[in-house]
Amino acid sequence: MPAGLHLLPRAPAELTSGRLRRLGEGVGKVVYCSEHWVVKRQRRASDIIALIVIWKLLRRLARILPAHMGEPLLQRPSKWIRLLRVMMQPVVVAIPRSVWLTTHIGQLWRVYHSRDARGERLARTYLAGTSLVPEHVTFPPVRVKVGGWPGWLTVSEATERVECTLYQRLKDLAASGRFDQLEAWLDRFLEFRQTGWQRGLFSVDAHLKNFGVTGDRVVLLDAGGLTDHWPEIERRLSVQEDAGEPHSQLGMGPLLLDRPDIAARFDARWKEIVSRDGVLRHWPGETKPQT
């Protein structure tokens, strides 16, 4: 068993005492929760391909529509995406996977699959048992009830449920006018990223919804974007330099609309810290690239 994982003799009682609520979903998994724990259902390859097709279509549609109509399409409307996936599923299944794999969609699926597997491996190796990730427990396989399809799952591991995503915390603080606290959480986020670099890990998908809040800590929720491959890190940093205002790229434009001073301070700190020199200052010496 990897270091940092807790092996329990049986599953936490709350996982089996009632039906687990559907908490959220991503490209590769669906998450269900009890009061203190979450479990995950991995999507089938055909589900992931269907979602990739849908997102490609939505992005094309968003580009030709006026901004006020196109942008909402890309804000992850979960129920609509679910419906579209169900409608797309027969088309995906009818076409052999070998055909899909020869297309750009197949290439995107392979990239997603390899990055997700690599990220999970890196998280198990370097982050398990640390304060950078929620607690993770394993136990003998047990059948649990879940809301919606398929109605039940067999699970053998669970992860500590966080209070909310980092994005949701920032959104709530902005809505209530607590901008001093919002800025403090942004500082914690930047400190969290630097702590990850000290362990030789960089996230190429550092969206605020991929991070959670528990107590006064920021934790990583989705390890799929983790990499220790320096050329990939440099490519990502290069793209970020030309991507515009960091706070807008992270989805905080609407949250900081009335506080351009906070947006400007965050953007300045981000550009200083999340840069080649900034990352190198924290990167472990034994794996640091030649400059």
Task: Please annotate each region the language model reported.
Residues 80-186:
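Conserved structural core of kinase catalytic domains
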